[in-house]
Design a protein with these regions (language model features):
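Short, conserved catalytic or interaction motifs in soluble domains
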Residues: 44, 63, 70
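Short, charged recognition helix plus adjacent turn
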Residues: 59, 69-75
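Short alpha-helical DNA-recognition segment
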Residues: 22-41
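Short basic helix-loop element that most often maps to the first helix and adjoining turn
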Residues: 12-27, 56
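Short, basic-rich loop-to-helix N-cap that marks the start of a DNA-contacting helix
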Residues: 46-56
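Residue-level detection of the helix-turn-helix DNA-binding "recognition helix"
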Residues: 19, 33, 44, 73
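A detector for short, charged/polar N-terminal pre-domain segments
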Residues: 1-9
């Protein structure tokens, strides 16, 4: 899997989980302690996040990092 497609799949997984929980990008960003632009860029697959950012997002979405990556990998 190429790096750009990995980022795109990860972003789609985060977007799907966020919308399932009825969270806006702004709300998720606030809960995770990151800027709203980071969430938007991540969901579009144009941001390469740190593990700490992914961990914060996963925690607020109620999933583990493993679940987040498995969901993205299955796309």
């Amino acid at each position: 899997m190429r790096s750009r497609s990995i980022l795109r799949s990860l972003g789609q997984e985060i977007r799907d989980l966020r919308t399932q929980k009825n969270l806006s990008q702004e709300t998720l960003a606030g809960l995770a302690g990151i800027h709203t632009n980071v969430v938007g860029r991540l969901e579009r697959g144009i941001y390469n996040p740190t593990v700490l950012i992914l961990a914060a997002i996963a925690l607020k979405l109620g999933v583990t990092l493993e679940q987040l990556f498995k969901g993205a990998e299955g796309r």
